[in-house]
Curated annotation (Swiss-Prot):
A single cellular component GO annotation: carboxysome
Transmembrane segments: none
Family to which the UniProt record says this protein belongs: In the N-terminal section; belongs to the N-acetylglucosamine-1-phosphate uridyltransferase family. In the C-terminal section; belongs to the transferase hexapeptide repeat family.
PANTHER family: BIFUNCTIONAL PROTEIN GLMU, NUCLEOTIDYL TRANSFERASE
Gene that this sequence comes from: glmU
Pathway named in the protein's UniProt entry: Nucleotide-sugar biosynthesis; UDP-N-acetyl-alpha-D-glucosamine biosynthesis; N-acetyl-alpha-D-glucosamine 1-phosphate from alpha-D-glucosamine 6-phosphate (route II): step 2/2; Nucleotide-sugar biosynthesis; UDP-N-acetyl-alpha-D-glucosamine biosynthesis; UDP-N-acetyl-alpha-D-glucosamine from N-acetyl-alpha-D-glucosamine 1-phosphate: step 1/1; Bacterial outer membrane biogenesis; LPS lipid A biosynthesis
Binding site residues for UDP-N-acetyl-alpha-D-glucosamine: 7-10, 21, 73, 78-79, 140, 155, 170, 224, 329, 347, 362, 373
Binding site for Mg(2+): 103, 224
Function: Catalyzes the last two sequential reactions in the de novo biosynthetic pathway for UDP-N-acetylglucosamine (UDP-GlcNAc). The C-terminal domain catalyzes the transfer of acetyl group from acetyl coenzyme A to glucosamine-1-phosphate (GlcN-1-P) to produce N-acetylglucosamine-1-phosphate (GlcNAc-1-P), which is converted into UDP-GlcNAc by the transfer of uridine 5-monophosphate (from uridine 5-triphosphate), a reaction catalyzed by the N-terminal domain.
Protein name: Bifunctional protein GlmU
Region (N-acetyltransferase): 248-456
GO biological process, one term: regulation of cell shape
Active site (UniProt): 359
Amino acid sequence: MVAVAVLAAGKGTRMKSDLPKVLHQLGGYSLVERVLQSCRPLAPERQILIVGYQAAAVESSLAGRSDVEFVEQREQLGTGHAIQQLLPCLQDYQGDLLVLNGDAPLLRSETLENLLATHQRHGNAATLLTAHLPDPKGYGRVFCNGDNRVTQIVEDRDCNAAQRQNHRVNGGIYCFHWPRLAAALPKLSANNDQKEYYLTEVVDYLDQVMAVDVDDYLEINGINDRKQLAAANDILQNRIKDDWMAQGITLINPDSITIDDTVVLEADVIIEPNTHLRGKTVIGRGSRIGPGSLIEDSIVGSDASVLFSVVSQSQIGDGCRLGPYSHVRGEADIQANCRIGNFVEVKKSVIGAQSNVAHLSYLGDAMLGQRVNVGAGTITANYDGVSKHATVIGSGTKTGANSVFVAPVQVGEGVTVAAGSVINRDVPAGSLAIARPRQRIIDNWQVPPAPQSGQP
């Protein structure tokens, strides 16, 4: 039986932001969301977030999580003081408590599982996650005997010169037997440089305290400023991209590519340089994305290509060709084997299979049938200044260059729309629609001569 407490009360002054530190984003999730995700495989009985600075904003960010409780630390007087706030709500709890930092989002679930298993196997009062750092500056040092039993923990700011030579550091991740921890918490003092209550002091009041080393010391990295946030993003991205390449995905110039860990890539996908895949995006088998493309919360079918284009909240069918420089957004549905060409924007529209929108067009709130050919410069005028209106174009229709459809309007199947037409009435199937002024020619026309210099 395990409960989880996440320390999320700090302001994060070094972030230089009005946003609480734990709400800064890393790969599509806030830092604190990533911490909560890491402990999900443990199936904790309770998850408690200890909040303080902008508590309402932090709670609001997790409003959809009914499994998360909140406890407020009104004054931020240290990690020990934060855990003391749990005494009332856990007074009858008899299990283990896992303590995590809300600004340490790189922990792997496997690391926490190993920490908990070691703690329970040895019947420890406390088990600490430790790491051997090349540069331990800023971290508390952990001193152990030969059996990994902890004898002392000293915060970095309180270390003397000899203690600073120890590179085994406290990762700030703990597993406690709660009843024994609860008995020790009232004994904490603020007898240190910061006048804070350190959770590490409980080691002095507990027996059987053990340290467990993390395999990859980068997992314990905390985030205190923008530089560390950028470094964490690099670490996360390298993990994600290494995993995908191991599964048979081709990444050309991986350093220029970013992929959220919510993205799904099917076999034989190729990702070209300077491409970014975000949110709940799925890329189908054999598709080629990029270079220079952004796809967010969208589904791309098999054997499709997206070149120098932006796709958001939309669906792209099998065999489609997008780009260069197309923009598909707002729940658009591009069905199989369509071509969406250069400088084309499609918004909240359905484009039927085998249709072509090759260049310089805007289709908004439109529904196109199959095999529609949209001429260059075709526009759906869908907004009347108050409301959006639909344009319906039937299968097999061809629109001439520089056509405008003033919605709401319906065009039947097999229609030909003459170039330069402004269509503001419904057009029956199988017809030719011409809606433009007649061409006028004036014979023997000469451009008037330009005025000479000095004349008005």
